Amino acid sequence: MTRWEIARERSHRHFASAPFVASAAASGGAGAAVRDGDGDKTYEAIIVVAGGMTDDGGLPAWVTSRLDFVKEEYDRHVAAKREAPYVVLAGSATPHKPPPLAKGGFLLHESTAMATYLADRGVPRAKMLKDTASMDTIGNAYFTLTSHAIPRGWRDVLIVTSKFHMGRTRAAFEWVWNLYVPSSDGAGAAAGDAAPSAPHVRLSFHATPDDGLDASVIEARAAREAKSEAALRKNATEVTTLAAFAEWQFTTHMCYAVLRQDEIGEFEEMKTDPALKSY
């Protein structure tokens, strides 16, 4: 098989998310919040990865845990009289179940629901940015990079998600964001340029507790997460430029490829999977 055929086959098998498995990004007891980095560090942006919604458009406890930490981190910057970071809310919907609808029958994006939650708790709307294109973790990484980080020239970014989701999140963001090669004039380098030896953007990660999930759900999700993380890290060794990544994502991935768009809306695989309760 060619390199692209191998990547395509992997994408067909491993496009979804799964529970947290211990990695350099997060460790410790079940449900513990784990931080990688300096608690006094200043960030230009905090990205919170979406984690699903209830059928009526509410946010589950493991998602509000992420957002409550983001509010604390935002307030820490303000209290220290540092420049307030942007808060990026990453996620549209999940491919694993139908999305709830908003006013007027429009899709209620997960990022919109998260923005409302933070706005109600005092985070200024002018400091929040949305990604309404991504449907999974690798999409979160790609669209936050290309829509927000590159145009704004960010160099220090904090990524927030739940403990069960951190392994795959770290694999996705480190793969995609480390492909970005800026040119000397501040614009993006040629799309096919190889990734630099040192990342242009410094990424930190924070894992929040798996609130609201029982052990059986976390165990089921963890099995899915482990497979997805392994597939991401394997693909990262074969897809090594941003141009190659875009080709891979938009021609092989179920959530983004026209070739596979008819697969969206088929939920049979997930109906009996306990992990569905974590989406």
Residue map of PLM features:
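A structural signal for short, hydrophobic/glycine-enriched beta-strand patches
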Residues: T2-S228, Y279
